Amino acid sequence: YGNEQGTGAGIKQGLQQAGLKREDIFVTTKLYNGDQGNADKVTNAFNGQLQALGLDYIDLYLMHWPVDAHFIESYHAMEQLYKAGKIRAIGVSNFDNDRMEKLLEAAEIVPAVNQMEFNPTNQERDILTFDQSHGIQLAAWSPLGGGRSLKNPVIEKLADKYHKTAAQIILRWEWQRDLIMVVKSVHEDRIISNSQIFDFELSDEDVQTINQLDEGKRGLWYSDFQWHDPNAKIANAIDHWDDTDPSKPL
């Protein structure tokens, strides 16, 4: 997301101030869609990211989206980085079951993680079940679901019942469903509040109540991008992927 250099500087400063070591923290970054391709291309991109972060290794390296023409060879390149000790775990993002099946058929190493949009109104049940059956951990991006989930009357009622915020109710529900939650905020008070979910537990009945809120409404999916239309002239053309780093030559 163009923030690796700043993140690296923050990590260095934070470790020094807190008296911590590199192994005390867990760092995840992603392979740009525009950097997918053969081993040389992926490796060069990864080395650039490592340099920007100022680190010797990455704890988890994720493929951002499955570029249909390249995700298999890109994953093989990631496997080689894993074997070389540059990555401690490899994973993917936004893989539906069809693409995950294709990847598993070709992969030597099962992805540790599949990062998906997941929240009370978009629960990706089929993908969650498939991933869990293959030992793949689902990590939730957009875990709070925006206003559609946070302002849901059911969530608000549970927040009153447990004397917690709506966000804390949602995050606790996801924690009890064995998910990793990728929560973002620039507000210190919200960051602290979002972490305070371990002093209470939702009842099984309340977990099931939130389970019933699923509407299957994704905020972002393949159909939202022109490059996933097989009839489009730029289908799978990596120089048109939205996250292609503009500072790099195509």
Where are these predicted regions, by residue range?
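Active-site groove signature of glycoside hydrolases
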Residues: L53-A69
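Acidic (Asp/Glu)-rich catalytic clusters
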Residues: G8-R22, N47-D56, Q80-Y82, L104-A107, ...
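Beta/alpha (TIM)-barrel catalytic core signal, keyed to glycine-rich beta->alpha loops juxtaposed to Asp/Glu
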Residues: W65-L250
